[in-house]
Amino acid sequence: KKLDADVHVLMTQNATNFINPITFETLTGNKCLVDTFDRNFQYSVEHVSLAKKADVVMLAPASANVIGKIAGGIADDMLTTTVMACRCKKIIAPAMNTNMFENPIVQDNLKKLEYYGYEVISPAVGYLACGDTGAGKMPEPELLLEYILKEVAREKDMRGLKVLVT
């Protein structure tokens, strides 16, 4: 928002256990969408409308669950239905326990997403929420922003840019 981007945040129901959607609504000035069938908006097919507006999608933090759903073509919530409808660049930042991140199934799903054009940002190494230390930490927000700016090839000026953050 500070860079004049129109930022929309989508969350899974599970993500609301970690942070309240109101936080993102306050920061972006846009409704944070969780429920695919939320009726508190002017009628439109919301996930398709958002997908058409987005210039870039940043999936951060991306859980093993979300990665698996998208890699498997599962679209069963606001986040996954919107991502499936997007034709813009998609950037994904996995964040999870090291053992989960290194699991061959998760690695195969990330390779599959790369094959389909997703850019995967390697997780940071450090102290994780579970108490372990290792790869799996979400990269710093400044690094995520660098990836977005690189994609849109604009230095600090995001005026008119539509960014979808999940």
What are the functions of these language-model segments?
Residues 1-90, 97-166:
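A cross-family phosphate/adenosyl-ligand binding-site feature
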